[in-house]
Amino acid sequence: MIKKLVSILIFMILNCISFASISATELSWDIGLTEQRNLITARGIMYEKNAPTILYLAGLEGSSQNSAVLNALLENYSQSSPTDSAVNLIVIANANPDSESLQFPPTGAAFSENSVSHVLWRWIGTHAPDLIVLEAGQDFGFSTALEEIGIAGFGNIPIESLSASNTTMQFLRFSSDLARSQARAELDRRTARTPRAVAEQLAAIYGYDFSSPVYVPGMSIIGRLRLGYIDSVNDLLSPYLIGESFEISNASVMAGQLVFAEHARITGNETSQGLVLSAANLAFDENDQPFEAMPMHYEMSDSFFMATPLLAKAGVLSGDDRYFDMAIRHTAYMRKLLLRDNGLYRHSPDADVAWSRGNGFPAYGLALSLSEFPKAHPARDVMLGYLVDHLEALLPYQDIDGMWHEVIDYPGSFAEITSTAMIGMAIKQGLDNGWLAETAYRPALNKAWNAIKIRTSFDGIFINACTSTGKMPSLEAYLDRLAIFGRDDRAGGMVMNFAIDMAGL
C-alpha cells in the first residue's frame, strides 16, 4: 500500500513538473498588406512546437462580428492554466479589412494583384495548421481549393465551420489528439532536412547554364563547385577557358566573374585567375590609378556585392594589396552614398527605401570580402565595423518566423527569401570568424535557416523571391515588386550557398 502511494505521489510530482515546464508564448504577426496598404495581422498563443495547431479565420468578406468572439477566445486561452492548454492557437480575426474581392487559389502577380488572396494563401501555407476553423459564408473558393489542390504547395488542411461549439475552451482542451494535417506533415518534412540535403536537392536543379556569364546563374555554379561537381562545372566554363570572349558591360557580368574566382581557388586554373584579375582591373584607369569607386555601380547598393568581393578575391589570387585597398575605397564610397540614419541602406538615391536585397547585398558582399581580407590590412577593421554595424541595424527587423521583408522596415511587406538567405550567410560567416556575439546572432541564424527550409520545396520551388529589381522611384514601386512563387535561379543560388554554409562545407 505504501509503495502504491509513493508511486502515485511520484507520478503526481512528475506531472506537476511537466505542466510547470509548459509556458505560453504570445505572438503577433504582420502577415501582409491589402491593396490599400492596410495591415493584415494574426495573433497566436504557442505552447509546444509539436503540439497541434488550430487556426481560426474570420472576416474573408470584410468586417465580421465573429472577430470579437475570436479575440475573446484568444484572450481566455492566453490566461488559462498550462494543464488546460493542449494546442497552439492562431487567430486571423479580420482577414480582409478592406473587403477586397478574393480568389482562391490566387491568380495574378503577387502582391500587386489579388493582394489579400495571395497574402492569406502563402502565409497560412507556411504556417501549416492542423485544422482551420473558418467563418461560415462566402469563402471565395478557399475550402474547395484546399481540398482539391492543397495550400501553397504544402497539401490539405481540414476545415470546420465556425460555431458556438468550436469557439470554447472545452473544444481547445479536447483537441490535443488532433491529427497532423497533410500541410503540417510537409512542413515537418522540409524542416527535418539537413543543410547538405537542401544543397544537393537544389544542385540537382540549378547551375547548369552559364551561357551568359552573370551572377544569377553563377551563384548556383559556385554552389556546385563547393559541393564538388568540378567536372560538370568545367564543361560549363570550357568555352570561356579556351578563349570565348565576353564584355563586362554591367555589374551583373562583373559579379559573374566570382564563378571564375571560385574555380581558380579550387582548381588553380590560370585562365580563370586571369579572367578575375581582368575584371578587377576595371577599378583602375590607364595610368593604373584607382577610380573613386568601381565602375558600373549605378549608385545601387547591389554594388557592395557586385564589386567588392571580386576585388578581395583578386587580392588573394594575385597577392597584390591594391585590390584590397580598392575594395575598401569602393565600400566607403557606396556607404557614404547610401547609408541611412537607421543603419540600413537605401537601394539608390532615387528613393529612400530599405529594399530587401538592397540590404542583403551589402551584408553578404562585405562578409564575403572580409573572409578574404588579410588580418593585417590596415582597413580590415574598418570594413568589419561597417558589417557589424549593418547587421546590428538589421537584427531588430527579423520577424518572429526568422525572415526579413521586401522593405526591411515596412510592416506587412512580404517575407523575402533571397535577402534572408544573404543576411543569413553574412551572420554565419560572422559567427564562424568570431566577428559576432553568439548570444545575439546564433538564434537569429537558426531562425533564418528554419524559415528558409519551410519556404524551399524538395523540387526547388520557392515562396516569395523578389524578382529582378533595378532602381525604383518610390516606396510603392518596391512594395509592388513581383514575389515569385516557383522556381527561380536567383533564389536557387543564394539558398544553395546558404545551405552549404550551414553544412560547414
Residue ranges and their predicted role:
Residues 41-50:
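Short beta-strand-to-loop junctions in surface cap/lid or active-site-entrance loops
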